[in-house]
A protein has these predicted regions:
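N-terminal pre-catalytic "stem/leader" segment of glycosyltransferase-like enzymes
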Residues: 1-97, 416-417, 428-440
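A nucleotide-sugar donor-handling region in carbohydrate enzymes
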Residues: 2-5, 132, 137-140, 148-151, ...
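C-terminal amphipathic helix plus adjacent low-complexity
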Residues: 2-5, 361-440
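Conserved catalytic-core segment of nucleotide-activated headgroup transferases in glycan assembly
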Residues: 52-65, 198, 204-284, 388-399, ...
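Extended catalytic core of nucleotide-activated donor transferases of GT-like folds
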Residues: 80-165
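Donor nucleotide-activated moiety binding/catalytic core segment of transferases
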Residues: 96-100, 279-314, 318-319
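A donor-sugar binding/catalytic signature common to diverse glycosyltransferases
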Residues: 115, 122-126, 298-343
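Catalytic binding pocket for nucleotide-activated donors in carbohydrate/polymer assembly enzymes
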Residues: 319-385
Length: 440
């Protein structure tokens, strides 16, 4: 070993160490050349969109503390992948170029979408990207309930049909993690060849919301809500049947009819809308329509604390509205495209239970009506159909991941699911979030 002025030449040590980590070391190839930890199991998290990345966060976090596992990220081709790379960077990840990811081999591939996955090498674990598998596949997709061709076939449940799970006659995932036994039954109807690889693990969002509800007042205080203030959460999914298409009818009513004192209103828009039209466009449309009286959340916001804190939910057929059935907040449906909804889903049951927002009656009287006629047991029955493994997602999901990796699990139970307290939307120092310009 070379000495420099009687000391170890650390540069030479680094050169020798780098020489032992040449191109091709391990499965992952050249990306590991300069790694400090070598011999790790290589995990690729495939982020198709901001929503998919948010959904996967609770899953890959189960691996984050294990020095035997190296988690990497890539952004897949997708119509809504604008913002996906920024999401990866926001959690401290580095984006592996898609072309490089397709050349390498991984010990585990994690994804909540389906596009492009046939290009990747490694056992694939697929997950849903929302709750309840509410939506049907697009009309005219040519995929029938049995996976046959033609344009007149029965529409499959979005995410559960062969168009999402089968490529070139082969079931792609090594495992398909589902939230509820009902979804497994849907796979049996729509894509029976994938039934053997399904596994019911529960729903991570469900567990985190459920764990946060007893501390609801802490979340309300963190957001800046004062005692007695009512929070109306307006949430929209994406697409032509969403609440967003009626924004010019809904938001002016919130701005004009709700008293400024005693109410706060927040708008949560599915990140796919911002990905398609730009965050600036969404913010501009919403703030102009609401005349500054509604706080607009950006696509990277964690919506779960808002849902926990909400006193009322005005929504549509999106996942957030369905999760609202857990909270005890009365729900009004402003839009619901019944023809595009899986009739066996909990979302369809919600549409038959929750009152519909009417343009012909005062908004405050409709909120009062929703509160008076709210029956907690009815909505609890809907919420129970989101997850058939309540409180057990982290344990069951971790067991599945380590089984695919071929590793023993860490010798401790996963940390209990915790929903972080949010930064204030409505600071109590005299500033106001009602202009729609704060934290967007």
């Amino acid at each position: 070993m070379t000495l420099v002025h009687g000391e170890v030449d650390h540069e030479e040590i680094e050169r020798r160490e780098a020489g032992r980590q040449e191109v091709g070391h391990g499965k992952a190839g050249s990306g590991r050349r300069w790694a400090t930890l070598t011999g790790c199991k290589e995990v690729l998290v495939v982020v198709h969109s901001t929503v998919y990345g948010q959904r996967l966060h609770d899953i890959y976090s189960l691996l984050g503390a294990d020095l035997r596992v190296h988690v990497q990220f890539t952004v897949a081709p997708h119509a809504f992948n604008a913002g996906a790379a920024a999401h990866v960077r926001s959690v401290g990840g580095t984006v592996l170029p898609w072309e490089e990811a397709a050349r390498r081999e991984f010990d585990l591939v994690l994804a909540a979408g389906s596009q492009g996955l046939e290009q990747l090498r490694g056992p694939l674990v697929r997950l849903p990207h929302g709750a309840g598998h509410i939506k049907l596949s697009p009309a005219g997709s040519g995929i029938g309930a049995g996976g046959g061709g033609g344009t007149g076939g029965t529409r499959t449940v979005s995410g559960l049909g062969p168009e999402y799970l089968v490529r070139n006659g082969r079931v792609m995932p090594a495992a398909f993690a589902l939230a509820h036994e009902e979804e497994r039954a849907e796979v049996g109807r729509g894509c029976p060849e994938a039934l053997p690889i399904t596994e019911v693990v529960g729903d991570g969002c469900y567990d985190r919301i459920a764990a946060a509800l007893p501390a609801r007042e802490r979340y309300r205080a963190a957001l800046g809500l004062r005692p007695g203030e009512r929070l109306v959460l307006v949430c929209s999914t994406w697409g032509s049947g969403s609440l967003f298409t009626r924004l010019d009818a809904v938001l002016p009513r919130l701005a004009g009819e709700l008293p400024r004192r005693g109410y706060r209103t927040a708008l949560l828009v599915h990140p796919n809308v911002a990905a398609a039209h730009s965050p600036w466009a969404v913010r501009s449309w919403a703030t102009a329509t609401a005349r500054g009286a509604v706080t607009v959340l950006g696509p990277e916001e964690d919506w779960r604390p808002l849902l926990v804190a909400a006193d009322f939910v005005i929504g549509d057929h999106g996942s957030v509205t369905l999760y609202g059935t857990m909270t005890g907040a009365p729900i009004l449906l402003a839009e619901y495209p019944h023809r595009d909804v899986n009739p066996r889903s909990p979302g369809a049951l919600l549409a038959r239970t929750a009152p519909a927002l009417s343009p012909a009656h005062p908004l405050t009287s409709q909120l009062d009506y929703a509160a008076r006629h709210y029956r907690r047991s009815e909505y609890a029955a809907i919420a129970a159909r989101i997850s058939s493994e309540p409180g057990r997602f982290d344990r069951r999901m971790r067991r599945l991941l380590y089984r695919v990796l071929g590793l023993g699990e860490p010798a401790h139970v996963p940390e209990p699911p915790v929903l972080p307290l949010p930064a204030p939307l409505w600071p109590r120092n005299g500033a106001t979030g009602r202009s729609g310009q704060g934290r967007q």
